[in-house]
Design a protein with these regions (language model features):
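Residues marking helix boundaries in flexible regions
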Residues: 6-8, 21, 57
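Bacterial N-terminal signal peptides that target proteins for export
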Residues: 1-13
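Carbohydrate-interacting regions of secretory-pathway proteins
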Residues: 26-270
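C-terminal segment of classical bacterial N-terminal signal peptides
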Residues: 15-24
Length: 270
């Protein structure tokens, strides 16, 4: 008889503990805005036990928090290039060659404000002919000529055959074609993944209109984004060939007369 009384008392204590736990859990759910759904109804939101942090938002292309303007919209202060090609008009940097003043050797407008290491660069460009590029982590080659750079380049061209790809001016050549993610090693270049087809990405680039460029260089990972779309990315594991910092610049390419326009230049050091 005493044994039965002890068992009954233990059962009663267990039942009371379960009731208290259930009531506590219900209050906690209500305090957090979570309630059990009615029978037969699926719960809303992510499954319990998973993260409930803020959702992922698209980054606006004109988001410049933490960036600094590297073009004042009026002058070429802080920039260095051949004055016969470069000027400022209507808050826009213009690089222009003519039949009378052709570009004989690829020449660059160089930013003298530093040699960024890890950074993000945003800008807009428009062009009417030939080929150009955004140069970064680059070095000067005075033996070749004044205003000549060697280094990574976000390629742009009027026909958009190469626009968006990663090229190395006066170096290893094509490092990641448009639509590719690559790994660069001393003896070979490998495709890690195909992002999208080159033609699909080409269709996202505007002709005779403004295009937005976003370059991210972080460590040995180099990323090119045009008009909000990932164009090319490379992981440069070639320790002897890669650059981890260097000059920024814009290219005027040899060939027929051309006009390159640049505006809204923003830089953020990471």
């Amino acid at each position: 008889m005493k044994r039965l009384i002890a068992i009954s008392a233990s059962a009663a204590l267990l039942a009371a503990a379960c009731l208290i736990f259930q009531q506590t859990a219900t209050k906690a759910q209500q305090a957090g805005g979570q309630q059990n759904p009615p029978p037969g109804q699926q719960p809303q939101g992510p499954p319990r036990g998973q993260g409930r942090g803020p959702g992922i938002e698209a980054l606006a292309v004109d988001e410049h928090a933490g960036f600094e303007a590297i073009f004042d919209g009026k002058t070429l202060k802080g920039w260095d290039g051949d004055p016969q090609f470069w000027r400022v008009e209507n808050e826009t940097i213009i690089g222009e060659s003519t039949a009378e003043k052709p570009v004989k050797v690829n020449t660059f407008l160089i930013w003298r404000g530093g040699q960024p290491k890890d950074f993000e660069l945003k800008l807009e460009y428009r062009m009417n002919s030939t080929n150009s590029g955004v140069q970064y982590r680059s070095v000067e080659l005075p033996d070749v000529g004044k205003w000549v750079l060697k280094g990574y380049q976000a390629d742009i061209d009027f026909e958009n055959r190469y626009t968006g790809q990663l090229y190395e001016e006066r170096g290893r050549g094509f490092l990641a074609m448009r639509g590719q993610m690559t790994r660069l090693q001393p003896s070979k270049k490998q495709i890690i993944a195909n992002l999208r087809s080159g033609d699909e990405l080409k269709a996202l680039i505007k002709n005779n209109d403004w295009n937005q460029v976003h370059i991210i260089a972080r460590g040995n990972v180099l990323t090119h984004i045009f008009n909000g779309h990932l164009m090319a990315q490379a992981v440069d594991d070639d320790a002897a060939g890669r650059a981890m910092s260097g000059l920024l610049g814009f290219q005027m390419h040899t060939g027929p007369p051309m006009k390159l326009e640049l505006r809204n230049l923003w830089l953020k050091n990471l």
